[in-house]
Amino acid sequence: MTVELRADLYKACLRISPRHADYATLSVEDGFDWSSLSRCSFGSLYLVVFRSVRRPEVDLDVLLYHDDRAYEEALASGGLLRYFKGQANERGECLSFCLWETREQAIQAADAASHRSATRISAQMYLSYVLERYWIQKLGEKLIFDRI
């Protein structure tokens, strides 16, 4: 991918935003405006969605500390196009995601020390959580979300 195409893709990814206030309970395709990607050139992108229900007594300072360290490490590792940090709704439901250039880059970041540290505190922070993984591909200007 040329520098110009990569810069366009990165800028387009920054424009991905929630389409609805209840995005955490919707499919990732419906909850967000992905239209900026339809104007970009790419083969496929790798999306990791983290859906969670926070414990009522969660220590937000601890959660944010671990989240921020994992984000910094992921950013430094390369390939992270967009990190969306969701806010929990009144029921504690939250959706965050990382959009990557490649699956390999996502796996590398997940194996980094700060990310492993964040996963170790998951049981203390969440009543439940699930990871969803997708390939995002283009068919003309249409985006295809293929859950894997």
Where are these regions (language model features)?
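Short, well-ordered beta-strand segments in beta-rich or mixed alpha/beta enzyme
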Residues: 48-52, 83-112
